[in-house]
């Protein structure tokens, strides 16, 4: 996605700890046209698989997942990182390490919104090591739903997340690929795949 690659090149900043700051694009401020294009691109990739749900993780995955679900015309469900008092009844849970949150996060999805009848596409903001996506895939598997594919806005190719997701046996689509980055200012971005 050329517009996204250009925007990351122009606005992306590398922070200590291997964190890519793109909060003016996808994590804090959202650009409507760019977000719409993300959804359209993911929908073209995954629409032929006939998903019934788009699933993501709060918070930064919500915008691209919602844009995708709007194009596909299917509901979007997001895993919560804290169980609210309104989440009554049984839930699927998983744990994952979050670099940006600085520790382990627990994920929650109500049984009410994910079932064995669902055909799921996961859309999220980043693919780094793949740990959080593997945790979410485990929740989907536990529900009996069929995981059809995963899409991530930005992939940090050097963290091997794609290889870690290979065991899932589903297509993985990314929109921008960070080939190399360092705190000295190096940021090499290519189109995703």
From Swiss-Prot:
Single GO MF descriptor: xanthine phosphoribosyltransferase activity
Keywords (A to Z) from UniProt: Cytoplasm, Glycosyltransferase, Purine salvage, Transferase
Main location: cytoplasm
Origin superkingdom: Bacteria
Reaction catalyzed: XMP + diphosphate = xanthine + 5-phospho-alpha-D-ribose 1-diphosphate
Class of this enzyme: transferase
Enzyme Commission identifier(s): 2.4.2.22
Cysteine pairings via disulfide bonds: none
Binding positions (xanthine): 20, 27, 156
Binding site for 5-phospho-alpha-D-ribose 1-diphosphate: 128-132
GO biological process: purine ribonucleoside salvage; xanthine metabolic process; XMP salvage
Coiled-coil region: none
Keyword Transferase: yes
InterPro entries linked: PRibTrfase_dom, PRTase-like, Pur/Pyrimidine_PRTase, Xanthine_PRibTrfase
Any Gene Ontology CC annotation: cytoplasm
Protein localization: Cytoplasm
Pathways per UniProt: Purine metabolism; XMP biosynthesis via salvage pathway; XMP from xanthine: step 1/1
Similarity comment text for this entry: Belongs to the purine/pyrimidine phosphoribosyltransferase family. Xpt subfamily.
HAMAP family: XPRTase (MF_01184)
Assembly and oligomerization: Homodimer.
Function: Converts the preformed base xanthine, a product of nucleic acid breakdown, to xanthosine 5'-monophosphate (XMP), so it can be reused for RNA or DNA synthesis.
Protein name according to UniProt: Xanthine phosphoribosyltransferase
Organism of provenance: Deinococcus deserti (strain DSM 17065 / CIP 109153 / LMG 22923 / VCD115)
Lineage, uppermost ranks: Bacteria, Thermotogati, Deinococcota, Deinococci, Deinococcales
């Amino acid at each position: 996605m050329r517009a996204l690659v250009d925007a990351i090149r122009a606005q992306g900043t590398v922070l200590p700890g291997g964190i890519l700051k793109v909060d003016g694009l996808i994590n804090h401020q959202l650009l409507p046209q760019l977000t719409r294009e993300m959804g359209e691109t993911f929908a073209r990739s995954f629409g032929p698989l006939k998903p019934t749900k788009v699933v993501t993780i709060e918070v930064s995955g919500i915008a691209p997942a919602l844009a995708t679900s709007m194009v596909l015309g299917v509901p979007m469900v997001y895993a919560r990182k804290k169980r609210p008092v309104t989440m009554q009844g049984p839930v699927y849970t998983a744990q994952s390490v979050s670099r940006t949150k600085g520790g382990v996060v627990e994920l929650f999805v109500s049984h009410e919104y994910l079932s064995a009848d669902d055909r799921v596409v996961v859309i999220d903001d980043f693919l780094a090591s793949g740990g959080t996506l593997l945790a979410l895939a485990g929740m989907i598997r536990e529900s009996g739903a069929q995981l059809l594919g995963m899409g991530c806005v930005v992939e940090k190719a050097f963290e091997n997340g794609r290889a870690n997701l290979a065991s899932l046996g589903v297509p993985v689509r990314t929109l921008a690929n960070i080939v190399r980055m360092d705190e000295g200012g190096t940021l090499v971005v290519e189109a995703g795949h």
